[in-house]
């Protein structure tokens, strides 16, 4: 054991001396001598071998020295267990391309048959027979692999030619150049197969440094597996390796190398920044390492986000240091889980002088997932995924706050531009906010920098990860002034297309293409001096167009009253199929009405046949209901009943409709009420309700007017309990007025209800006279009441005698009614209607009140039109 340790120490010293001599004598002769000693396998070879240790090339794993592979097997060599970077000469390049490149051209694939270690004899034999033949090939591979060898002491490839290498450059200069070139190549790659490109570069930098790799790789191993192994091995030892046994490691060497810091040697730009950490609990670790990838196909037959694996072939996703454990199964799953990744926290770095300097502050994490242990550090830092992820959606308060901040920034920049117009102030892109459709439309109309309103945005590209992103606002005054006209025009255009009201106005303002014949008629109608001899036969083929035109419709209406039947028939045959459409046309409905008035019986029957089955629809339309009313006037009674019967199941709906109530009224007027029993039966229990309805009160009046005595009695029996309410109702007062207008020769029930109304009015004459709607009932009571009924009402208003009339109190009924804006009309009716002593007392009371107003110089009611009218009435009245 002690002998082995002494031998190890001697070999270590020999390695250091060899490295120093190689650095001081970097000529090719020394390199060849060193290489010769290695090849011969003697003592000189063992003395020539050495390790040049650097902090960036240390390792914590067991590895075999590459050059020792030439000395013998791992079992026979005591020096084989040392882990140091080889400084010997690299082995010669093999002309058998399959050893390095395989059948597919991938030099990661090695064959197990070519992994036997080389002896000195076989090496010399190989060198003797293949040096001259492979000189050109070695030069090509030398250029392909970046002109770099892991050997410090010798040439890039031992091919027997002293001038094969450019001996003027040392190891570190070559190594640095290859690192820079490789780093640039890695950073410039943006293809999905960048993993293969990175593995190729690493292999170029360190290939042929050791033949021990051939003992560790199996035949036809997939490129992804090789790539991970290459990355893992090159980071830890600086050479390509895979440990085949853990029993041969030296515990003392592991403890000796444990304190060396681990550096990233492949990405020069990131070496002072990222330091890998094997502690899974280190949340603020700076270096992020990728794990070992699973075995899978290397032919890139699967999408890059699946790491080249077919779907549903793996169950557990890879572990990332300081990243959550997730499956990379689909882009959406990948993106959604990468949003919550861990961001490296703040960390102090150490400069070249050994002093710590503070790094820029960064958020430590987005979430706090548990990070798995780092089993295989990647040779270069994994990029921050948050740099490529779209921002998460903002909440409503955050969106409002962002909008307010954006508006404040725009206002400040506009103010700065006003102060100094020669300075350009860039404006950040505003954050798009989802909003309702109407609000978007409003924003689009009023935002001149919206893509729809600004032609300068044609060359601008929005963020593809953001929906409805808005380009940067152009704050140049010159550009704003030059594009103002276009923006205004576009704003008007978007305004017309964004509001339904604007669209309807635009449709109304559209210019219809009229026929020359219609244009001629319109021109002749506007010119009063023109004498147009056009008749119905002249518009043959244009009847429908004329019916829908204002001037054309008037022309047809005028001609139908005087034209012969033949010409009417020609026009009717053109429009008969469009009778339903024309009935609801603003101008065409008058033509259909004229055909009911002046048309033949056959023409009327044809129109009635088209109306059958459409009565409900036509009765509810604004213009068609007028056609139905005209038809009920001119068609036969049987046809009227047949048409109205279609409305039997919708009488209440028709009565409450602003158009349908006119059809019901016309039906009651033109059809005997006994033929329409369904109308009154539908209104049973709804009489008072309909009497207070704006349209129903009209139908109730028509029923009282044209109904039979039994019908009138049934209606009045429902109304007599609601007389005080109907008198003061804005629609019910019309029903009461109709009852008051009926004379005494009507049926007994009507006379009794009228007397009841007069008594109710007389008992509340002052209150009803001052009421806006009830005052109308009081006036009708005075006008249409009998002499006894009139005297009953007047007795509640007139003063007792002449002295009382000259000295009326302010709270007397006469004075209260004169002052009121509604009741003074009742007083005017009393002056015109009253006779004899009653009229004399009324005139005296009015004059006394007017004299009192003049003496008191009161301006309260002096100049009211009603008071002046009263003064004019009593001035000429004879007392």
From Swiss-Prot:
Modified positions (Phosphoserine) are 207, 210
Q: Which Gene3D superfamilies match?
A: Leucine-rich Repeat Variant
Q: Where in the cell is it found?
A: Mitochondrion outer membrane; Cytoplasm
What are the record keywords, sorted? Cytoplasm, Membrane, Mitochondrion, Mitochondrion outer membrane, Phosphoprotein, Repeat, RNA-binding
Q: Where is the composition biased (Pro residues)?
A: 370-395
State the Pumilio repeat positions. Answer: 538-573, 574-609, 610-645, 646-681, 682-717, 718-759, 760-795, 807-844
Every PUM-HD domain range: 513-871
Membrane topology category: Peripheral membrane protein
Q: What is the official name of this protein in its record? A: mRNA-binding protein PUF3
């Amino acid at each position: 054991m002690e002998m082995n340790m002494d031998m190890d120490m001697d070999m270590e010293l020999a390695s250091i001396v060899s490295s120093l001599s190689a650095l001081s004598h970097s000529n090719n002769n020394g390199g060849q001598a060193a290489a010769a000693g290695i090849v011969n396998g003697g003592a000189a070879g063992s003395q020539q071998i050495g390790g040049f240790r650097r902090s960036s090339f240390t390792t914590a794993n067991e590895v075999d020295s590459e050059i020792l592979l030439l000395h013998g097997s791992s079992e026979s060599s005591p020096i084989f267990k040392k882990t140091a970077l080889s400084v010997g000469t690299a082995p010669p390049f093999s002309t058998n391309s399959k050893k390095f490149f395989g059948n597919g051209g991938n030099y990661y694939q090695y064959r197990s048959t070519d992994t036997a270690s080389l002896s000195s004899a076989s090496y010399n034999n190989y060198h003797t027979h293949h040096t001259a033949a492979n000189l050109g090939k070695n030069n090509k591979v030398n250029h392909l692999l970046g002109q770099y060898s892991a050997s410090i002491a010798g040439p890039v490839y031992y091919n027997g030619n002293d001038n094969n290498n450019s001996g003027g450059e040392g190891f570190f200069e070559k190594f640095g150049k290859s690192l820079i070139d490789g780093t640039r190549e890695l950073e410039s790659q943006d293809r999905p197969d960048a993993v293969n490109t990175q593995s190729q570069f690493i292999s170029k930098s360190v290939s042929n440094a050791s033949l021990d790799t051939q003992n560790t790789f199996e035949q036809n191993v997939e490129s992804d597996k090789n790539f991970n192994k290459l990355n893992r091995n090159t980071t830890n030892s600086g050479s390509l390796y895979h440990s085949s046994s853990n029993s041969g490691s030296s515990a003392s060497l592991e403890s000796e190398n444990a304190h060396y810091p681990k550096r990233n040697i492949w990405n020069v730009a990131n070496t002072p920044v990222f330091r890998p950490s094997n502690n899974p609990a280190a949340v603020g670790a700076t270096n992020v390492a990728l794990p070992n990838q699973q075995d899978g196909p290397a032919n890139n037959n699967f999408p890059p986000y699946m790491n080249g694996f077919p779907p549903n072939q793996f169950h557990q996703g890879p572990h990332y240091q300081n990243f959550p454990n997730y499956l990379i199964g689909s882009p959406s799953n990948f993106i959604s889980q990468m949003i919550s990744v861990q961001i490296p926290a703040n960390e102090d770095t150490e400069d070249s002088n050994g002093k710590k300097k503070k790094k820029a502050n960064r958020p430590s994490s987005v979430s706090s997932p548990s990070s798995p242990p780092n089993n295989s550090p990647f040779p270069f830092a994994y990029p921050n995924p948050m740099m490529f992820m779209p921002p998460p959606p903002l909440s409503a308060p955050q969106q409002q706050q962002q909008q307010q901040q954006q508006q404040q920034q725009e206002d400040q920049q506009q103010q700065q531009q006003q102060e100094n117009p020669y300075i350009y102030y860039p404006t950040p892109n505003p954050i798009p906010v989802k909003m309702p459709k109407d609000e978007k439309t409003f924003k689009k109309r009023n935002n001149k920098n919206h893509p729809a309103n600004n032609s300068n945005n044609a060359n601008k590209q929005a963020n593809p990860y953001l929906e409805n992103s808005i380009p940067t606002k152009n704050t140049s005054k010159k550009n704003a002034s030059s594009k103002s006209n276009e923006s205004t025009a576009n704003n008007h255009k978007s305004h017309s297309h964004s509001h339904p009201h604007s669209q309807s106005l635009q449709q109304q303002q559209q210019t219809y293409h009229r026929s020359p014949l219609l244009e001629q008629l319109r021109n002749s109608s506007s010119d009063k001096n023109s004498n147009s001899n056009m008749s119905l036969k002249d518009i043959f083929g244009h009847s429908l167009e004329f019916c829908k035109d204002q001037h054309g419709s008037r022309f047809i209406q005028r001609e139908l009253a005087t034209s012969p039947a033949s010409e009417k028939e020609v026009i009717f045959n053109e429009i008969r199929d469009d009778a339903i459409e024309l009935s609801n046309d603003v101008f065409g409905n008058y033509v259909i009405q004229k055909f009911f008035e002046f048309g033949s019986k056959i023409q009327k029957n044809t129109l009635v046949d088209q109306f059958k089955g459409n009565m409900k629809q036509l009765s509810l339309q604004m213009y068609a209901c007028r056609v139905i009313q005209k038809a009920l006037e001119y068609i036969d009674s049987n046809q009227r009943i047949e048409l109205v019967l279609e409305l039997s199941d919708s009488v209440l709906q028709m009565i409450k409709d602003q158009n349908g109530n006119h059809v019901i009224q016309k039906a009651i007027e033109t059809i005997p009420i006994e033929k329409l029993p369904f109308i009154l039966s539908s209104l049973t229990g709804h009489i008072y309700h309909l009497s207070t309805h704006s349209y129903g009160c009209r139908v109730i009046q028509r029923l009282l007017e044209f109904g039979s005595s039994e019908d009138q009695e049934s209606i009045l029996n429902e109304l007599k309990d609601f007389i005080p309410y109907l008198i003061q109702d804005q629609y019910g007062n019309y029903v009461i007025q109709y009852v008051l207008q009926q004379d005494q020769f009507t049926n007994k029930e009507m006379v009794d209800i009228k007397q009841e109304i007069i008594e109710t009015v007389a008992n509340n004459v002052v209150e009803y006279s001052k009421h806006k709607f009830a005052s109308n009932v009081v006036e009708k009571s005075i006008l249409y009441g009998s002499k006894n009924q009139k005297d009953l009402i007047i007795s509640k208003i007139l003063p007792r005698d002449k002295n009382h009339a000259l000295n009326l109190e302010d709270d007397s009924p006469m004075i209260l009614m004169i002052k009121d804006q509604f009741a003074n009309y009742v007083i005017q009716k009393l002056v015109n209607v009253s006779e004899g002593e009653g009229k004399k007392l009324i005139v005296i009371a009015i004059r006394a009140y007017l004299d009192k107003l003049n003496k008191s110089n009161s301006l309260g009611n002096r100049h009211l039109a009603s008071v002046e009218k009263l003064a004019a009435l009593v001035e000429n009245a004879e007392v």
